[in-house]
Amino acid sequence: MSLPDDSRYLKGGPVAQRIIAAVREDAAIAKAEGFPPKLISITVGDTDAVDVYVRNQRAKAQLAGIDFEERRFPATITSGELEAAIHGLNADPRVTGIIIQRPVPAHISVKTLQAAVHPLKDVEGMHPASIGNIVYNQLDLAPCTAAASVELLKETGLDLKGLEVVVVGHSEIVGKPIAFLLMSEGATVTVCHHLTRSVAAHARRADALFVAVGKPRLIKADMVKPGAAVIDIGINSEIGPDGTSRIVGDVDTDSVKDVASWITPVPGGVGPITVAILLRNTMVALSRQRALYEATYGTADRLAAE
């Protein structure tokens, strides 16, 4: 889908291309030094929607020079068997990062699987240790969607120090990490959720408004401060007047774009950057793994000298 040529739209494509270009340079250097980056994608069962994501991840990984391999498991597999497979990948030095594709069958806890991934191979930034590290301003392995959302806000050129930010939605992998990422940049952050008494009152005073709740067109123009930046992270399927399904966000873009100075389109905003962040995280993970390897066994130069 082509997006209108409107300066108010914060388009993710150009940002993603920039990130992937940098990753491609780093990956080429790592390969030349004998450390080729490799991603393993884990899919459980047959889900068409997952296949779309995997194809996109594979294509972008190839573009960045990162090896990508998919491991498929039957929907009948037990949680214990999957965890054992993940532990095997954790122990494989050829594997840089592990991706758990969602959804998984109801009898399996995706949180349990994510916790089974070693933090050094957690390129999605969803291991409890990775999320916890954000509190301590260790930000380079943050959850991909959260990091992508903040990346788009930075595209506005707004000074984040002291910026009044409101985050609508407080999930463990999007809303909460966004809040901590922004606080680390010096922003003043308010988080709204289903128990917040007046989301509109909070939203109207935000210089930057992030929305991730999964409710189509929740945010209307009268809830947005004039001149604000609006980052729409929602992805919802909606039946249009012609009976066809279309993707819309949590923001009523048609009305809000006339109030906000910047707004992310859905699709085409946060989404493209999310995969780019995944690839950038892969190189961060590889760097950490190499540092551990060299601390344990020494660098190639040191080993040769010995």
From Swiss-Prot:
Q: What is its EC number?
A: 1.5.1.5, 3.5.4.9
Tell me yes or no: is Hydrolase among this UniProt entry's keywords.
Answer: yes
Q: Which GO molecular-function terms appear in the entry?
A: methenyltetrahydrofolate cyclohydrolase activity; methylenetetrahydrofolate dehydrogenase (NADP+) activity
Q: In which pathway does it act?
A: One-carbon metabolism; tetrahydrofolate interconversion
Residue positions annotated to bind NADP(+) are: G169, H170, S171, I235
Q: List the InterPro entries.
A: Aminoacid_DH-like_N_sf, NAD(P)-bd_dom_sf, THF_DH/CycHdrlase, THF_DH/CycHdrlase_cat_dom, THF_DH/CycHdrlase_CS, THF_DH/CycHdrlase_NAD-bd_dom
Q: Which Gene3D superfamilies match?
A: Leucine Dehydrogenase, chain A, domain 1 (3.40.50.10860), NAD(P)-binding Rossmann-like Domain (3.40.50.720)
Record keywords, A-Z: Amino-acid biosynthesis, Histidine biosynthesis, Hydrolase, Methionine biosynthesis, Multifunctional enzyme, NADP, One-carbon metabolism, Oxidoreductase, Purine biosynthesis
Q: Name one GO cellular component term.
A: cytosol
- Top-rank taxon, per record: Bacteria
Q: How does it assemble?
A: Homodimer.
The family classification in the record reads:
Belongs to the tetrahydrofolate dehydrogenase/cyclohydrolase family.
The role this protein plays is: Catalyzes the oxidation of 5,10-methylenetetrahydrofolate to 5,10-methenyltetrahydrofolate and then the hydrolysis of 5,10-methenyltetrahydrofolate to 10-formyltetrahydrofolate.
Q: What is this protein called?
A: Bifunctional protein FolD 2
User: What's the source species for this entry?
Assistant: Mesorhizobium japonicum (strain LMG 29417 / CECT 9101 / MAFF 303099) (Mesorhizobium loti (strain MAFF 303099))
The gene is: folD2
